[in-house]
Amino acid sequence: MKIKETYKTKEKIMNNSLTEEQVKVLNMSQSVINEVRKVIIGKDEIIIKVLLSILAGGHILIEDIPGVGKTTLAVALSKALSLDYKRLQFTPDVLPTDVTGFTILNKETHKFEYKQGAALTNLFLADEINRTSSKTQSALLEVMEEGKVTVDGITHKMPDPYIVIATQNPVGSIGTQMLPESQMDRFIVRLTMGYPNLESEVAMLKSKQNLVPVDNVRPVVSAEDILQARKVVENIYVSDQVFQYIVMLANATRNNEYIKLGLSPRGTIALLRMTKATALLKGRDYVIPDDVIYSLSLIHISEPTRQAEI
C-alpha cells in the first residue's frame, strides 16, 4: 500500500472533497515515513502498516529474528513522532514491577514514593516478550488494555498517546514460549519485517559507512498531532453495507475449519479502526470493501489449524 500523493494542493483537495484536517493527516503521515525510511531502508510497507496501527489507536506485535531492525524502527518512530521512548528486554528474570513500577519508602520524608516502571512512557518497546514469565506478560498486557496501572491501591494513568511495540522471537527459538490467544488479541496487528532485499541491504551498508544514525531522524509530528489524527480517522465515513461486510468477514473467520480461533468482537472493532485509517491514507474520506480486505490481512487472527498446515 502507498499513501495517496495526489492530495497535496488546495485545488486537488477541493476536487477530492477531503477536508483540510484530513489532508494534514496525509501530509503528516508522509513526513513520518520520509524520516523513518532514513534508517529503515526498503521497508516502506512495514512503516506504513505500523503507522496505520498507530492512527487506529492500537498496539503492534512484530515477530522476527534478532537483528532485522525492530528496535531501530521503534526508536526512529519515537523521534519522528516526538514521543518519549523506553525499552525493556523481557528476560526470564524480569518482574511485573519492572513493567508497572513499585512504591518505596523514602527514608528522609518517611513517605512511600512511586517509582515508575518501564511501561510508563508514550512509546514502549517490549523486546522479546515471549522470553519472560506469563505473570510479567500479563502485567504488560493489562497495562495495554486498561491504559493505567494500579500499584498499592493507587492508579497511575499512561501518557496519551500510549503505544506498545512488542517483539517476539519465532516460536521454537530457545527460551521462548507462545503467547496465549487471549494476550495476542490485545495487539491490533502482527507483523514480520523480514530480511532486506539486495538493493536495500547494499544501501543500508553504504548509509552505515556514511554514519547516518537514528539521531538524524527529525521530529515532524507532535503527540497532540497524533491524538488529533486519531479523531480525524474516527470520523471517516462507513456505510451500513460496509459495516455488514466487516461483520460477515469476522463471522467467516469464526466458522472456518482452517482457523483455530476467529476474530473476536474486540478484533472486529480493531478491524473497523484499521479500515478507516487505511481509507484515509489511500486518499478517501469513506471506506470501501478493498480497505476492509487490506486491513483484515493485517489484523491478528489465530494460528491455522493442523488441518490447514497439512
Regions found by a protein language model. Give the residues of each.
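Conserved C-terminal helix/linker of AAA+ ATPases
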Residues: V221, F243-Q244, R284-L298
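Walker B catalytic acidic pair
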Residues: D127-E128, A139
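Conserved alpha-helical scaffold flanking the Walker A/P-loop in AAA+ ATPase domains
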Residues: K49, N106-L125
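Single conserved hydrophobic/aromatic residue that forms the stacking wall/gate
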Residues: I299-I310
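Canonical AAA+ ATPase core
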Residues: N106-K111, T132, T136, M144-V221, ...
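Conserved AAA+ ATPase small/helical "lid" subdomain
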Residues: N216-T268
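Pre-Walker A (pre-P-loop) alpha-helix and adjacent loop at the N terminus of AAA/AAA+ ATPase modules
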Residues: L26-I60, I65
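Walker A/P-loop
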Residues: L55-T91
